[in-house]
Amino acid sequence: KIRGKQSASVCLAIDYKKGDRPIALVGNGLRTCRRATVSRIQRGIVMSDWKVAGKYFEACNCEAICPCIVFSPPTTGECIAVLAWQIEEGHHGDTDLSGLNAALAAHAVGNMKDGNWRVALYIDSDADEAQASAIGAIFSGQAGGHLENLAPLIGEVLGAKPASISLKSDGKRFSMSIDGIMSSEYGSIEGQGGGDVEVSGHPLAPVPGVAFKIGRSDQFKFNDY
């Protein structure tokens, strides 16, 4: 099983602004949006246009700022990370995805750049059949986009299942939960002049072209598979 005990993990949280190169907006109260559109033919299958706009959350079990951003091994010898997306507006073809959430759990022993990740996808239990299929396609990388570029790092897909996913933020405090599976709460770290501490351009970023806001968690728990 992938199990994460309570720890003082370092977490990331970013918002997206609509545009070709999104801008990090965490904590400023502005409406957030991320555009990602794919329209192409791959392996004989016509890929639908899709767009998701909203907030991104991430938490892991490392006890320092995520070592993977400089290709270093995790502080505990293994990384257990949960990535989550809060879709404020979105669609996949004609299927509306607004108001739904998705999460991806990843487990890697040793350096994350070496691959062999074990991953599991969690799809908002409020999604109907068409919405669940669309979310699964987008956040597994099957619909194209940046997540498809990370697919070679995955060694095993443990499964995909519906779940109640809660994602909350007020710009300074953040919380993530997958009912009965995962929970984390964290706050931003104040930098020079009271500004946010941010990291941008790291090679394993699940969303390129934006700055990640660094925070420290009060707790991180994960137990599934």
Question: Each PLM stretch: what is its role?
Answer:
Residues 1, 17-18, 31, 40:
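Charged/polar low-complexity intrinsically disordered segments
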Residues 2-13:
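Extreme N-terminal basic, low-complexity initiation segments
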Residues 19-26:
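N-terminal amphipathic/hydrophobic targeting modules at extreme N-termini
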Residues 28-46:
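Short, Lys/Arg-enriched N-terminal segments with co-localized hydrophobic residues
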Residues 48-92:
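N-terminal ordered "arm"
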Residues 99-225:
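Internal, well-folded beta-alpha domain core
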